[in-house]
């Protein structure tokens, strides 16, 4: 864990190889461990429901605000002119 404080290796220094191997191993393993069996429970039916509902809810609110804005904003622009 001592390589965390080191800068990104750009020169051929002595700590470059352990940093790159451990860093690559950590970067290679951690996301897959994070996306592994433990998070399949997180990516299970509950989150598929969330992934199915949240974007549509966001798009629904965005289109609702856009309709509200497009309905009232041009009317106010016509009044100002």
From Swiss-Prot:
Keywords noted in UniProt: Membrane, Mitochondrion, Mitochondrion outer membrane, Transmembrane, Transmembrane helix
Polar residues bias spans: 11-22
Record's GO cellular component terms: mitochondrial outer membrane
Coiled coil: none
Location of the region described as Disordered in the Swiss-Prot/TrEMBL record: 1-22
Compartmental location: Mitochondrion outer membrane
Transmembrane parts of this sequence: 50-66
Bilayer topology term: Single-pass membrane protein
Note: This protein is produced by a bicistronic gene which also produces the major prion protein/PRNP from an overlapping reading frame. The alternative prion protein and PRNP (AC P10279) have no apparent direct functional relation since a mutation that removes the start codon of the AltPrP has no apparent effect on the biology of PRNP. In mouse and hamster, the alternative initiation AUG codon is absent and is replaced by a GUG codon.
Protein's name in the database: Alternative prion protein
Species of provenance: Bos taurus
């Amino acid at each position: 864990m001592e390589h965390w404080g080191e800068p990104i290796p750009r020169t051929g220094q002595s700590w470059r190889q352990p940093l790159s191997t451990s860093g690559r191993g950590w970067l290679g393993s951690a996301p897959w461990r994070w996306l592994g069996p433990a998070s399949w429970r997180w990516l299970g039916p509950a989150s598929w429901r969330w992934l199915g509902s949240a974007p549509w809810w966001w798009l629904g609110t965005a289109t609702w605000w856009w309709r509200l804005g497009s309905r009232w904003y041009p009317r106010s622009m016509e009044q100002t002119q």
